[in-house]
């Protein structure tokens, strides 16, 4: 079962702000979140039924610091199309 704690943040980039005008928000989550799980979270905690949910996996970059390789964490992004009358201002998790 998906939980509200699996949602890390709402992304605020130039592209995501342009999509917000069309009613689409971009949500960053843990890699284990699924489309159906995200829909359940939106229904349960926000009282909103998303019209459409698209997902995208982003692999973490491999970075070097003083000769030691490290890896940034993997994440998953969701593009959530909301109904016209629904709005989510911020997500305080």
From Swiss-Prot:
Membership in a protein family: Belongs to the universal ribosomal protein uL23 family.
Keywords: Ribonucleoprotein, Ribosomal protein, RNA-binding, rRNA-binding
Protein name: Large ribosomal subunit protein uL23
Quaternary context: Part of the 50S ribosomal subunit. Contacts protein L29, and trigger factor when it is bound to the ribosome.
InterPro entries: Nucleotide-bd_a/b_plait_sf, Ribosomal_uL23-like, Ribosomal_uL23/eL15/eS24_sf
Organism: Sulfurovum sp. (strain NBC37-1)
CC terms in the record's Gene Ontology section: ribonucleoprotein complex; ribosome
GO biological process entries: translation
Function: One of the early assembly proteins it binds 23S rRNA. One of the proteins that surrounds the polypeptide exit tunnel on the outside of the ribosome. Forms the main docking site for trigger factor binding to the ribosome.
SUPFAM superfamilies: Ribosomal proteins S24e, L23 and L15e (SSF54189)
Gene3D superfamilies: 3.30.70.330
């Amino acid at each position: 079962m998906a939980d509200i704690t699996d949602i890390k943040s709402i992304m605020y980039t130039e592209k995501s702000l342009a999509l917000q005008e069309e009613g689409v928000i971009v949500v960053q989550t843990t890699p284990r979140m699924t489309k159906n799980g995200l829909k359940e979270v939106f229904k349960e905690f926000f009282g909103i039924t998303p019209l459409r949910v698209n997902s995208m996996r982003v692999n973490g970059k491999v970075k070097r610091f003083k000769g030691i390789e490290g890896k940034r964490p993997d994440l998953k992004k969701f593009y959530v199309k909301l109904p016209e009358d629904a709005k989510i201002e911020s997500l305080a998790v």
